[in-house]
Amino acid sequence: MKLCVTVLSLLMLVAAFCSPALSAPMGSDPPTACCFSYTARKLPRNFVVDYYETSSLCSQPAVVFQTKRSKQVCADPSESWVQEYVYDLELN
């Protein structure tokens, strides 16, 4: 029992020091979400509720669509349907 308490305490201590909030220097930007591949299919427009563009720090540009089911789907910003969806979302 004493060993379990010691191991659990040690694991909690390690987890606290490995926390992303503690490992980043103060004032630094949060981790950036990047896309490494795009969806091969056009999403149904009624599934998409929001979008954002990936950071310029990413290796390739992307538009990330948020779906009604809270999924995030990476899309190629040069595709015409992606540009149409972004335009439509900006208007609404």
UniProtKB/Swiss-Prot annotation:
Any Pfam family: IL8
Disulfide bond listed as a keyword: yes
Processing and modification events after translation: N-terminal processed form MIP-1-beta(3-69) is produced by proteolytic cleavage after secretion from peripheral blood lymphocytes.
Keywords carried by this UniProt record: Chemotaxis, Cytokine, Disulfide bond, Inflammatory response, Secreted, Signal
Disulfide bridge positions per record: 34-58, 35-74
Function, as annotated: Monokine with inflammatory and chemokinetic properties. Binds to CCR5. One of the major HIV-suppressive factors produced by CD8+ T-cells. Recombinant MIP-1-beta induces a dose-dependent inhibition of different strains of HIV-1, HIV-2, and simian immunodeficiency virus (SIV). The processed form MIP-1-beta(3-69) retains the abilities to induce down-modulation of surface expression of the chemokine receptor CCR5 and to inhibit the CCR5-mediated entry of HIV-1 in T-cells. MIP-1-beta(3-69) is also a ligand for CCR1 and CCR2 isoform B.
Quaternary state and interactors: Homodimer and heterodimer of MIP-1-alpha(4-69) and MIP-1-beta(3-69).
Annotated protein name in UniProt: C-C motif chemokine 4
Origin species: Homo sapiens
UniProt lineage: Eukaryota, Metazoa, Chordata, Craniata, Vertebrata
Gene assigned in the entry: CCL4
